[in-house]
């Protein structure tokens, strides 16, 4: 099966102004690792209008897709408007088509990855510093809500919720990969899963812990054929253990070249995993 890999489309009205259309390659399925736009309504509309007429779409939402909503409300909206369509949402859930299995979730983060000068500190202290800096600079904590009807709470997202959701997703992915499957196993997350995916332009920054967590133990133990992620605005294609890790983000207009390949299509068959690119 030919799978088009893409993430971080960040669709906006400026795309039309700057003649930045999305090029649709020839493929059997689109694997989209989130951040389609800056709210869930526009994101789902974009997929229905631009990609789903050409091929099925399997996606997980990115952090930007939750902006202006709570995580649960955005997921509820996305499930409602993708049910029975050519767009298939994954959040701690699995999609199967022919010999391809895709296990997906946003993933979020545990704030524990080491890519900074505080790597020598105990993990609790390291996490505290990463959370402190991330809350200062990340829009997630200003634009994603935290709603708990039982407590009457309507506030903004807290790092603790990200961490809880991360570990829930981590356990789900681990469990699903442990189930027998004859064919290709692919994991799809928005957040990154290794230091190797981090953008070298931001090497050493404490806030890298908000972009990636270290899931290499699961990768090496469970051996999925592919792990697709987004969130990092830098093309990545490397092998971790027996797993090919891929990230193909379009990114923002102002960022310039980040290695994005408009027609990045891979062969998912276990017997034939050579890449084909239309651009």
Task: Indicate where each model-derived feature is located.
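N-terminal active-site segment of His-dependent metallophosphoesterases
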Residues: 1-60, 66-74, 152, 159, ...
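Active-site environment of divalent metal-dependent phosphoester hydrolases
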Residues: 10-16, 38-42, 64-74, 94-97, ...
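Charged helix-capping and loop-helix junction motifs
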Residues: 44-48, 73-77, 205-213
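A basic- and aromatic-enriched beta-loop-alpha substructure that forms the phosphate/nucleotide-
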Residues: 58-65, 70-126
């Amino acid at each position: 099966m030919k799978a088009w890999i893409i993430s971080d489309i960040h669709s906006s009205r400026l795309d039309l102004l700057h003649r930045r259309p999305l090029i649709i390659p020839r493929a059997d399925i689109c694997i989209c690792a989130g951040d389609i736009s800056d709210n869930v309504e526009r994101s789902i509309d974009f997929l229905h209008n631009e990609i789903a007429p050409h091929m099925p779409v399997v996606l997980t939402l990115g952090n930007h897709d939750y902006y202006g909503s709570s995580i649960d409300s955005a997921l509820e909206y996305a499930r409602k408007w993708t049910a029975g369509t050519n767009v298939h949402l994954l959040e701690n859930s699995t999609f199967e088509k022919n010999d391809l299995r895709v296990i997906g979730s946003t993933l979020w983060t545990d704030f524990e990855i080491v890519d900074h000068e505080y790597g020598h500190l105990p993990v609790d202290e390291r996490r505290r510093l990463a959370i402190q800096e991330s809350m200062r600079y990340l829009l997630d904590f200003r634009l994603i809500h935290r709603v708990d009807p039982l407590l009457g709470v309507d506030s903004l997202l807290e790092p603790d919720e990200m961490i809880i959701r991360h570990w829930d997703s981590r356990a789900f992915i681990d469990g699903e990969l442990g189930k027998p499957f004859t064919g290709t196993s692919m994991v799809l997350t928005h957040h990154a899963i290794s230091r190797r995916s981090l953008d070298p332009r931001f090497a050493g920054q404490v806030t890298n812990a908000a972009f990636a967590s270290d899931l290499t133990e699961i990768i090496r133990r469970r051996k999925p054929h592919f792990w697709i992620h987004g969130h990092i605005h830098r093309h990545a294609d490397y092998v971790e253990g027996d797993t090919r890790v891929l990230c193909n983000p379009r990114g923002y207009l102002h960022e310039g070249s980040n290695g994005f390949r408009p027609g990045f299509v891979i062969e998912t068959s276990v017997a034939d995993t050579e890449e084909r690119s239309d651009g």
